[in-house]
A protein has these predicted regions:
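Short, compositionally biased
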Residues: 314-325
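Cofactor-/ligand-binding subdomain signature composed of acidic, glycine-rich
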Residues: 276, 282, 302
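Short, structured beta-strand/loop micro-motifs enriched in basic residues and often containing a Trp
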Residues: 280-292
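Non-transmembrane, aqueous-exposed alpha-helical and coiled segments at domain scale
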Residues: 1-156, 161-277
Length: 325
């Protein structure tokens, strides 16, 4: 009930897009991302193979057979580079030392937009009081902006034994991979979810006014705040998001078989019976000339929804420019 017209418009449009994507032919987002695999291999699991190579082969075949966009650019020198034409290399991290006979996987397709909205801030203990931390978060929430396609799944990690550990924690938390962490610390220095600060950050995001791309309340779906141990002289803080496409899935291989997380296959059940009631968008005919278009636009605030018709010249960004190389 508190959603703005723009919030409603974005939510409804995204649900319609999900219904199309659920048919398995067109992806939710044309940026089908860097393929990331985070795996934990039980100490009793023996494959007799180059696991990373096998996973990379699966990435290659999937992107080729499903006609997904190739986004990886490979360098030949510091200056010269070209699209790999396969979406390889993938990021594959395999960890061992876990007891048992299970091979667990988290697969993420991370688009450039959400990856670019990953930030590391090197802070100190001076940040660790309610007033300073609240001010810091209010300030840096605006670093996210809207170019990574909100509503976001927002993750914040405060602390970490290293900068890379802090950043890795944020990536996993934004995918919901750390949801089962404990909710309090201990003398052993375990990481934990701070549920109180998750509520505080959620409130900050809703009151920011940024909204779901065009102003409003729903900048984020949800928030994960992870507190981690740190070196006494350091306090890394990482902020990152999973975008509205939110493409991640868990899997595991056990002696009983192969198991894949079941995702929603019928998003249409979330659609309202009727489109949400919204104020009409402003109609603009681009063929009437830029002077007239500008005169119309100056009458309306930023965040006004527009219906454009006429000749539209599209400037392709650098990611798309590399695809045909």
């Amino acid at each position: 009930p508190e959603a703005t017209d723009n919030d409603k418009f974005v939510a409804y449009t995204m649900l319609l897009n999900q219904c199309v994507a659920a048919e398995g032919e067109l992806p939710t987002c044309q940026d089908t991302g860097t393929a990331i695999c985070i795996a934990h291999k039980g100490e009793d699991v023996w494959t007799g193979a180059d696991d990373a190579r096998c996973i990379a082969r699966g990435v290659y075949e999937t992107y080729k057979e499903r006609n997904l966009r190739y986004s990886q650019v490979v360098p030949f020198s510091m200056i010269d580079e070209k699209n790999s034409g396969t979406n390889l290399p993938a990021q594959i991290d395999i960890y061992g030392g876990k007891p048992g006979m299970e091979y667990e996987f988290l697969f993420i397709t991370k688009g450039g937009g959400s990856a670019n909205k990953t930030f590391l801030y090197q802070q100190t203990k001076a940040l660790l009081n309610e007033e300073s931390l609240t001010k810091f978060i209010k300030q840096h929430i605006f670093d996210l902006g809207t170019s990574a396609c909100p509503p976001y799944h927002l993750a914040i990690c405060i602390g970490g034994t290293s900068a890379e550990m802090c950043l890795s924690t944020v990536k996993k938390a934004s995918a919901g991979y750390l949801d089962e962490l404990p909710t309090s610390g201990n003398e052993g220095g375990r990481c934990f979810r701070d549920l109180e600060w998750e509520e505080k950050v959620l409130k900050i995001c809703r009151e920011s006014g940024v909204g779901a791309q065009f102003g409003g309340k729903y900048l984020v779906h949800d928030v994960r705040v992870i507190r981690a141990p740190r070196h006494a002289a350091s306090c890394p803080v990482a902020i990152g998001v999973s975008c509205s496409a939110d493409r991640n899935i868990k899997a595991k291989i056990t002696p009983e078989g192969i198991f894949l997380e079941q995702l929603e296959k019928n998003p249409a059940r979330f659609l309202p019976k009727e489109a949400p009631a919204m104020s009409p968008a402003v109609d603009i005919d681009l063929d009437e000339g830029m002077d007239k278009v500008r005169a119309i636009l100056t009458k309306y605030p930023i965040k006004t929804r527009l219906n454009l018709r006429g000749t539209l010249i599209v400037a392709r960004d650098i990611a798309h420019a590399r695809i045909k190389q």
